[in-house]
Amino acid sequence: MEEKHYEKTRDRRSDAGFFRCAAIVIPYLNPAELAAISCTSKSLYQISKTITSRRTSDASRGSENLPIPFLNPISDDSQPYSYFFYTPTQTLRLRPDFRQAWGSNDQSRLCRKEGRPDPFLLRVEGASGCECASCNGDCCPCLEADEFLLTRECGPSCKCGLGCGNRVTQGGVTVRLKMVKDEKKGWGLYAAEFIPRGQFVCEYAGELLSTKEATRRQQTYDKLASITPALLVVKEHLPSGNKCMRINIDATRIGNIARFVNHSCDGGNLDTVIVRSSGALLPRICFFASRDIQENEELTFSYGDIRLRPNGQPCFCGTATCAGILPSENT
């Protein structure tokens, strides 16, 4: 009897150890790997199902202020969510073997504990900033906006903190959003509440690339019809007028919910704004509402001028000005 009791106790401990390990390892699996292990046992099937449900409930993995769920109304579609690595801010190039947990039980708690990542990838040593305690008025020297859709905010060289009124883009998403799948366009980002004109929506986050690397990747993406790229190129014209700074952000593999914003040939309802912060070396690309946006309305912007290509991807924006083909960066 004692021997049988010992064996049962040992088996229970073994099972408990297995499930603890599974809870740690399985969130790192991609959808194909998750589907494969779910077929091996009832227990792993339930674990995989739970992880899928958590992934569907929040694309941001708890990194944003509000959950951003996936909603798939296509009944015969087997993909309840889109798999990608998440970063709420700019990041450097990833290692090829990079993995990221998604769907663990305590992921949201860990994100809150660790806090939001520093939005400034590189800083300017010795840069001067404002001395304001909280820049809620128009007197802050950092506060500036112009007709070229360039905004200046307080940054790492300023005395104020994240609660400053001139740091609206640095605290993450503050409006309710959702991902909805369309039969033609695939996943798109939608407003889950009314968004007033001028409201900050989200940053365009992803890998910050050199122009050489961005050109190489774009040429690769052009050849691979199976990949839907999310490489954004924005050119900031310098005061001289005859030169420009090119900003290349690739959210194809790692990015945030901005990677799901689809193109609209009529310009869409979002403005692409270059945001510079005092003491930060590099600007950030952010989306602001260009007009009032209604609840359940899709968020869109213009990818740029149409470049006619024989193998160009079709456009399904459905606007009266639709050109029938998506813009593509001229490399």
Residue map of PLM features:
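Skp1-binding F-box subdomain of Cullin-RING ligase substrate receptors
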Residues: 1-118
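Amphipathic alpha-helical protein-protein interaction segments
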Residues: 7-18, 27-37, 125, 147, ...
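Eukaryotic intrinsically disordered and solvent-exposed regulatory patches
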Residues: 9-12, 30-32, 115-119, 138-142, ...
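Intrinsically disordered, low-complexity regions enriched in proline, serine, glycine
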Residues: 34-38, 47-49, 53-57, 140-144, ...
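Cys/His-rich Zn2+-coordinating "finger/knuckle" modules used by eukaryotic regulatory proteins
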Residues: 113-173, 299-300, 305-307, 312-331
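Catalytic cores of histone-lysine modification enzymes
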Residues: 167-276, 281
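Generic structural signal for buried aliphatic residues
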Residues: 195-201, 293-300
